[in-house]
């Protein structure tokens, strides 16, 4: 899907969506801080942008109001669609995003039933030389979470960032970022604290770094992260490093993950520029 534009007024957004529907182009609206207009069929992007330019010149043109009536939006003439919570979740997340979320939830439930130690014996970073060829361990540490707040925080960010990467750049790109960041952030963290750690935060920080820098250097990629959020991520790293909140944080994984994401975004945006 491709985001075409955002409107501060949801009624204006609906007017444009209704008009394009009469032209045979289906757009959808997602409500965030503004009304974001999305196009599923990206092959029609140029046509939609041309119509948008005409619409913005005179959104009060009678043909747009007429389109709303044709689309069945009478009453005040316009209204914006409301999407149920789960529909919004489904629309943003691709299959890889969902598989990871489900896997983390299943592992979390197992940890509540069997105990943390029992699950860690199977999924933790290799804690004995005899386990170094159990290759899944270099990645499955990311599935383990030790509190409800821990898993909710990580999965919210994973859904928001991983879903955006998968929708815009494909499942393959999300898989590559996830595997590389899980491996390298885990390696660094075990150097800091030993093998007994877990959580998706190393991958989440990689996605933060990737989405932010890729959006800055390659806006046409369609992904972005507000600068305020990347500043928040850096503040959180500093807070964890100096133990300002008295919480046990995987500081090594956070720093390594962020570095991995930034490096991958730099390389990918460089390659994108070369292709132009």
Curated annotation (Swiss-Prot):
Disulfide-bond pairs as recorded: none
Cited HAMAP family: Rhomboid_GlpG
Transmembrane segments: 94-114, 142-162, 169-189, 192-212, 229-249, 250-270
Keywords: Cell inner membrane, Cell membrane, Hydrolase, Membrane, Protease, Serine protease, Transmembrane, Transmembrane helix
Tagged with keyword Thylakoid: no
UniProt GO MF annotations: serine-type endopeptidase activity
Protein origin, superkingdom: Bacteria
Full protein name: Rhomboid protease GlpG
Membrane topology, as annotated: Multi-pass membrane protein
Function, in words: Rhomboid-type serine protease that catalyzes intramembrane proteolysis.
Taxonomic placement: Bacteria, Pseudomonadati, Pseudomonadota, Gammaproteobacteria, Enterobacterales
GO cellular component term, pick one: plasma membrane
């Amino acid at each position: 899907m491709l985001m075409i534009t955002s409107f501060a007024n949801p009624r204006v957004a609906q007017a444009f969506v209704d008009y394009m529907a009469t032209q045979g182009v289906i757009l959808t609206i997602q409500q965030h801080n503004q009304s974001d207009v999305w196009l599923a069929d990206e092959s029609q992007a140029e046509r939609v942008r041309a119509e948008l330019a005409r619409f913005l010149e005179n959104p009060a043109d009678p043909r747009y109001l007429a389109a709303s009536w044709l689309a069945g939006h009478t009453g005040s003439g316009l209204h914006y669609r409301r999407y149920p919570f789960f529909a919004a979740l489904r629309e943003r997340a691709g299959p890889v995003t969902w598989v990871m979320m489900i896997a983390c939830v299943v592992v979390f439930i197992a940890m509540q039933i069997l105990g943390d130690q029992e699950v860690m014996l199977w999924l933790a970073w290799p804690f004995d030389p005899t386990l170094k060829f159990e290759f899944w361990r270099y990645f499955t540490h990311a599935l383990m979470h030790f509190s409800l707040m821990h898993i909710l925080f990580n999965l919210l960010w994973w859904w928001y960032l991983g879903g955006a990467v998968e929708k815009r750049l494909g499942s393959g790109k999300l898989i590559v970022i996830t595997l590389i960041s899980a491996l390298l952030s885990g390696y660094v963290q075990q150097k800091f604290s030993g093998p007994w750690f877990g959580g998706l935060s190393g991958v989440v920080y990689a996605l933060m770094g990737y989405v932010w820098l890729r959006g800055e250097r390659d806006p046409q990629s369609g992904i972005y992260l507000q600068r305020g959020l990347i500043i928040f991520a850096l503040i959180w790293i500093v807070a964890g490093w100096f133990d300002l909140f008295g919480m046990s944080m995987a500081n090594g994984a956070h720093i390594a993950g962020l570095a991995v994401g930034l490096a991958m975004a730099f390389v990918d945006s460089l390659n994108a520029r070369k292709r132009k």
